[in-house]
Amino acid sequence: MGEKITEEREFQSISEIPEEEIDATNDEEKLADIVENEIEKEIRKSKTRKCKTIENFYYYILRDGKIYPASDYDIEVEKGKRSANDIYAFVETDVTRDFDEFLFDIDYGLPSISDILKFYLEKAGFRIANEVPTPNLKYYIHAVVEFGEDRPQYLAVNIYDIDSLARALRIPQIVEQKLGNKPRTITADEFNDIERIVAEEQPILAGYTYDEALRIPYHYYVDHNNSFKDDALKIAHAYLQLFPTPYQVCYEWKARWFNKIDCLKLERLKPSS
């Protein structure tokens, strides 16, 4: 893991991010460390503001390992100051105070269909009206932070390959049927139509659609509604068979920063029902 950042600093613009805090992006482990370091910075800033948690946020990691807020980078691209071709990974964070929800998110917290579809289409050469393209994006990173009463407790970083997710959801076949093979700019209506087919019309998990298959396990694992148990277990098994296993790194908060732990430790901490 990279050197810990012990000084609290506010970055007002992209150009103010110091070069010495940038790591090279060569593999998933380094991507996870980049994300972990960025979340630590957000936690330190929240403590400076006397906040007891952090907000959900979205970042891009570039091929050279630099990390930027996604909205800021999009603006820079639109102004012609940055290149969308440099975007290598997209980072989404979720923050929760519920340990069961934390475990659910790291086990079943796949990206939204909208995000997977957008990234796949742009990699395939399509453009989506009024969207900054990410033609070279390779990874979708989902980071989940679990907070206790006044401090963070655990962090899990899941790294998914975009192409593998798209294939599991049969997105290439549906795109070919609806749009053909010739890349072009597509409308919002065309995008929404494909998203609806992928999420709501194809029974891909134990006879359930993608949207249904995420709601049912949530009711069982997080809400502890046992009436969903049988279907939830069937869906969970099908889920593990269908979707690629992400590269996963887990951390526990110790004093001032996160330390890596065996992800199995988190499962052992789950209260027995």
From Swiss-Prot:
Pfam families: ATV_ORF273
Subcellular location: Virion
Protein's UniProt keywords contain Transcription regulation: no
Keywords for the protein's UniProt record, in alphabetical order: Virion
GO CC terms in record: virion component
Keyword Nucleotide-binding: no
Chief location of this protein within or outside the cell: virion
Source taxon at top rank: Viruses
Protein name: Structural protein ORF273
Source organism of the structure: Acidianus two-tailed virus
